[in-house]
């Protein structure tokens, strides 16, 4: 027979066990929101040598806010890979591509994750609601979309700066659709 102290401990233990069981990984609880849209683009055009955008790439970056707003509304979040600051600034093109959009809509650019930290960046993105824009390197995109839940991710063509990938979710399942920006930016810098 339990005394009142023993009953109290038994009840506390039961409550703790029930709480732990209820808090265990529930796939529905951890599934991405059905309103999540992940828009993925490659950085804009680059010069033959160097880490920055070319004039054509800068012109594309300046035109992107209008194009993306027309197609998807403005993003709620933006992600680019972390900048490297060694002898060069690798990944600066992604930052330069998204900057006009971030300025126009007063968005924070999340650059916390390295280019190949697919699982970590996907974990962060999949917790969001709304529209997430990711500007990434084309060679990394198949791994990136696989981390976002897409099964058969195609390669992104080396010469393609115009495509848009859109990952949407329904009942926790990811679907990848392709679109394009439809831009043909000028190759000269007018500034």
Outline where the language-model segments fall.
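Bacterial N-terminal signal peptides that target proteins for export
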Residues: 2-12
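C-terminal motif of bacterial Sec signal peptides marking the signal peptidase cleavage site
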Residues: 20-23
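Active-site-proximal alpha-helix that buttresses catalytic centers in soluble enzyme cores
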Residues: 26-129, 140-191
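Hydrophobic alpha-helical targeting segments used for export or membrane insertion
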Residues: 14-18
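Periplasmic-binding protein-like
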Residues: 132-135
């Amino acid at each position: 027979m339990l005394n009142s102290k023993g009953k109290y401990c038994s009840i506390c233990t039961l409550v703790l066990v029930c709480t732990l069981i209820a808090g265990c990984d529930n796939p529905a609880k951890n599934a991405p929101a059905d309103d999540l849209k992940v828009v993925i683009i490659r950085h804009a055009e680059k010069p033959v040598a160097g880490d920055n955008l070319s004039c054509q790439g800068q012109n594309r970056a300046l035109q992107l806010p209008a194009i993306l707003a027309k197609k998807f509304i403005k993003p709620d979040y933006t992600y680019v890979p972390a900048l490297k600051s060694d002898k060069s600034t690798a990944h600066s093109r992604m930052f330069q591509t998204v900057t006009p959009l971030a300025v126009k809509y007063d968005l924070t650019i999340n650059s916390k994750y390295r280019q190949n930290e697919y699982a970590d960046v996907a974990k962060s993105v999949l917790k969001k609601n709304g529209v997430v824009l990711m500007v990434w390197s084309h060679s990394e995109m198949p791994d990136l979309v696989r981390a976002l839940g897409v099964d058969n991710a195609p390669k992104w063509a080396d010469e393609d700066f115009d495509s848009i990938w859109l990952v949407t979710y329904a009942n926790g399942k990811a679907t990848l659709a392709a679109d394009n920006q439809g831009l043909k930016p000028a190759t000269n810098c007018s500034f």
